[in-house]
């Protein structure tokens, strides 16, 4: 029996090797053949210099000739895909509907200060980490990362018996010790949990492999239960976070504390997979970082690489549709320019606009109903939306005693029930029952802030929302949604500010202005369907091994590819993985192997120095 199993295993390995060679052994240039990192140059603060990179408005004369690809959307998924292709010698045009490139990495001005739109903190940005290495290669090492304070996160539990605080310290040992100090009677549970997090997170390469292998093969492996049997990551993708914590025997309060980070992926513990949660915990466990100079530095240092290869990144370029030829293959895009449409032709179209925008709005009506398109859409639904609050403060971080720590404020240990009650409430009552708040001080995270904005500071807060509360105004123009809309939005803002001022009483009299952005704001500026913060919902259905294998860069439409967070996971690093998967599919190269080889080469060179 065991001999038969061994022979079958060997046969499977041979088949996998041949399939892999056939799919990813092309002769495309290696974009990661050489280390392009160089010492960071001084921060560019000149507004005109930054505008030339980040705000190149669309015009026909600025469209490069003989394009190799067009990318829809300039978030990190789109920019990274374009940059990798540019490094392989491709001429790529990136089209952004907003006035500024960057997607969730762009910044905007409010009352003379700068706010980020989506980058609150990133993990594993120390020298030597793979995420840092990838970003160094697409920005030539010009992104500098500032470490945040330890604890990087502070969970605050407001209850009938007062306030409890649970710090999350940088460093695995310190992180675990911090938990055990708060839960001395549950040390064994904490040890089991942390070991499971480590084992599952290390298996994330299995999720990548699922998207590399032919779909029929992954379906076969899934059908016979081989994925969940041999892969801890795939197995954890079929178990909810709540289920795992209950099996470990954690108390209700410990379950809440271990689940505190769920707003970073937008799904409550009973509805998300433990695999995703483990990835996020492992991502931050060594500490958190913030881009020096703010999140717009990411786009600012990625775009020049695209331009040097003959490409361009153009803003104010709303793509109306993906063009198809007579054989049903993507062959370009149609861009709205004033009242006219401009057709741009190219052999490859990459969409960073997300699955819903791409399949439901950018494709011709007949193609939207293709069985394979409908199958993919049936696996996902729009994710959680949030209300953003942007607060301008008078005073430095020292004056105001502000830390670079993030604050997660909860009012109930049963996060699932609290959220379910909240989102099912009538919109008029909901502001009185906000279940959680995320609070951060971006100005305290950036070491260049004081030089750029002396004697002033910023605070941001995020509040979960039901899109249905704002749905009636979605057809109304921005800025003209009426008194009822503003009243509802302000009710959430005022309720949040009441909590914030109790937590930070030193800010009394220091608040200069408060601005709220509803899910409709997200929908308008980021083209996020239903204002979804993280694209497709990161629930158990989406993270099931079958769905992970099915949702990939290649689409049912030849020459049309997806990139970004919808084909891997949310966040900067998730979208970056989506870009690598997309670029690998287009170049027919395993870029992960290329990066690994370059990393080994760089390490060997450093040893000789």
UniProtKB/Swiss-Prot annotation:
Phylogenetic placement of the source organism: Eukaryota, Metazoa, Chordata, Craniata, Vertebrata
Gene Ontology terms: biological process: retinoid metabolic process; retinol metabolic process
Any one Pfam family match given in the protein's UniProt record, by short name: NAD_binding_8
Factors inducing expression: Up-regulated during starvation. Up-regulated by PPARG.
UniProt note: phenotype after gene disruption: Knockout mice fed either low-fat or high-fat (HFD) diets gain weight at a similar rate as their wild-type littermates and show normal insulin resistance and glucose tolerance. However, they exhibit increased adiposity and increased expression of key adipogenic markers, including PPAR-gamma and its target adipocyte P2 (aP2/FABP4), while maintained on an HFD.
E.C. code: 1.3.99.23
Range of residues in the leader sequence: 1-25
GO MF, any single term: all-trans-retinol 13,14-reductase activity
Reaction(s) catalysed by this chain's protein: all-trans-13,14-dihydroretinol + A = all-trans-retinol + AH2
Tissue and organ distribution: Predominantly expressed in the liver (at protein level). Also expressed at high levels in kidney, intestine, and white fat and brown fat. Weakly expressed in heart, skeletal muscle and testis and barely detected in the lung, brain and spleen. Up-regulated in the liver of diet-induced obese mice, compared to lean animals. Down-regulated in adipose tissue of obese mice; this decrease could be due to the impact of inflammatory cells on adipocytes.
Gene3D superfamilies: FAD/NAD(P)-binding domain (3.50.50.60)
Protein's organism: Mus musculus
Keywords per UniProt: Endoplasmic reticulum, FAD, Flavoprotein, Lipid metabolism, Membrane, NAD, NADP, Oxidoreductase, Signal
Protein's gene: Retsat
Name used for this protein in its record: All-trans-retinol 13,14-reductase
Function field: Catalyzes the saturation of all-trans-retinol to all-trans-13,14-dihydroretinol. Does not exhibit any activity toward all-trans-retinoic acid, nor 9-cis, 11-cis or 13-cis-retinol isomers. May play a role in the metabolism of vitamin A. Independently of retinol conversion, may regulate liver metabolism upstream of MLXIPL/ChREBP. Required for adipocyte differentiation in a 3T3-L1 cell culture model. This effect seems not to mimic the in vivo situation in which animals show increased adiposity in the absence of RETSAT.
Signal recorded as keyword: yes
Enzyme class: oxidoreductase
Cofactor: NAD(+); NADP(+); FAD
NAD in keyword set: yes
Membrane topology: Peripheral membrane protein
InterPro entries linked: FAD/NAD-bd_sf, Retinol_saturase
Entry's family note: Belongs to the carotenoid/retinoid oxidoreductase family. CrtISO subfamily.
Protein's cellular compartments: Endoplasmic reticulum membrane
């Amino acid at each position: 029996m065991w001999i038969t199993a061994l022979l079958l295993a060997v046969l499977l390995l041979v088949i996998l090797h041949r399939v892999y060679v056939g799919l990813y052994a092309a002769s495309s240039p290696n974009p990661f053949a050489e280390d392009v990192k160089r010492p960071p140059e001084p921060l560019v603060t000149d507004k005109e210099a930054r505008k030339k990179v980040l705000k190149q408005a669309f015009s026909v004369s600025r469209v490069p000739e003989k394009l190799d690809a067009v990318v829809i959307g300039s978030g990190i998924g789109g920019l990274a895909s374009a940059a990798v292709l540019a490094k392989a010698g491709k001429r790529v045009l990136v089209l952004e509907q907003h006035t500024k490139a960057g997607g969730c990495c762009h910044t905007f001005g409010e009352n003379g200060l700068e706010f980020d739109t989506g980058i609150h903190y990133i993990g594993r940005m120390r020298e030597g980490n793979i995420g840092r290495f990838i970003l160094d290669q697409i920005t030539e090492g010009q992104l500098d990362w500032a470490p945040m304070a330890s604890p990087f996160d502070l969970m605050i539990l407001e209850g009938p018996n007062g306030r409890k605080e649970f710090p999350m310290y940088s460093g695995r040992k310190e992180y675990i010790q911090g938990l055990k100090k708060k839960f001395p009677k549950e040390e064994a549970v904490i040890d089991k949990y942390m070991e499971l997090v480590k084992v599952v997170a290390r298996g994330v390469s299995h999720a990548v492999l699922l998207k590399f292998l032919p779909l029929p093969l992954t379906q076969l492996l899934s059908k016979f239960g081989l994925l969940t049997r041999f892969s801890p990551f795939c197995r954890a993708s079929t178990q909810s976070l709540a289920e795992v914590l209950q099996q470990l025997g954690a108390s209700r309060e410990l379950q809440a504390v271990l689940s505190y980070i769920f707003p970073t992926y937008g799904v409550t513990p009973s509805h998300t997979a433990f695999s995703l949660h483990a990835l996020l915990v492992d991502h931050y466990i060594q500490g958190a970082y913030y881009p020096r100079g703010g999140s717009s530095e990411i786009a600012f240092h990625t775009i020049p690489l695209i331009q040097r290869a003959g490409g361009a990144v153009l803003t104010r370029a709303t793509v109306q549709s993906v063009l198809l030829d007579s054989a049903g293959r993507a062959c370009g895009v149609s861009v709205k320019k004033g009242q006219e449409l401009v057709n741009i032709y190219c052999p490859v179209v990459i969409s960073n606009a997300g699955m819903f925008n791409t399949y439901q709005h950018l494709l011709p009506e007949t193609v939207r109903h293709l069985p394979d398109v409908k199958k993919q859409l049936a696996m996902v639904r729009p994710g959680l939306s949030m209300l953003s609050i942007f607060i301008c403060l008078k005073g430095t971080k020292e004056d105001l005693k502000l830390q670079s720590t993030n604050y997660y404020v909860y009012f109930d240990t049963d996060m699932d029930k609290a959220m379910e009650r909240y989102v099912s409430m009538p919109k008029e009552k909901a502001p009185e029952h906000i279940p959680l708040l995320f609070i951060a001080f971006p100005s305290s995270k950036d070491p260049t802030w004081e030089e750029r904005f002396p004697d002033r500071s910023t605070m941001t807060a995020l509040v979960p929302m039901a899109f249905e509360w704002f749905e009636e105004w979605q057809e109304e123009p921005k800025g003209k949604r009426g008194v009822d809309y503003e009243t509802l939005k302000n009710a959430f803002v005022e309720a949040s500010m009441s909590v914030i001022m109790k937590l930070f009483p030193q800010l009394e009299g220091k608040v200069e202005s408060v601005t709220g952005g509803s899910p409709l704001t997200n929908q308008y500026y980021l083209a996020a369907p239903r204002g979804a913060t993280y694209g497709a919902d990161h629930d158990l259905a989406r993270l099931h091994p079958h769905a992970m294998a099915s949702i990939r860069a290649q689409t049912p439409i030849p020459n049309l590819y997806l990139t970004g967070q919808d084909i891997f996971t949310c966040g900067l690093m998730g979208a970056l993985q989506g870009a690598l998967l997309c670029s690998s599919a287009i170049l027919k190269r395993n870029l992960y192997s290329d990066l690994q080889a370059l990393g080994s080469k760089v390490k060997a060179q450093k040893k000789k120095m």
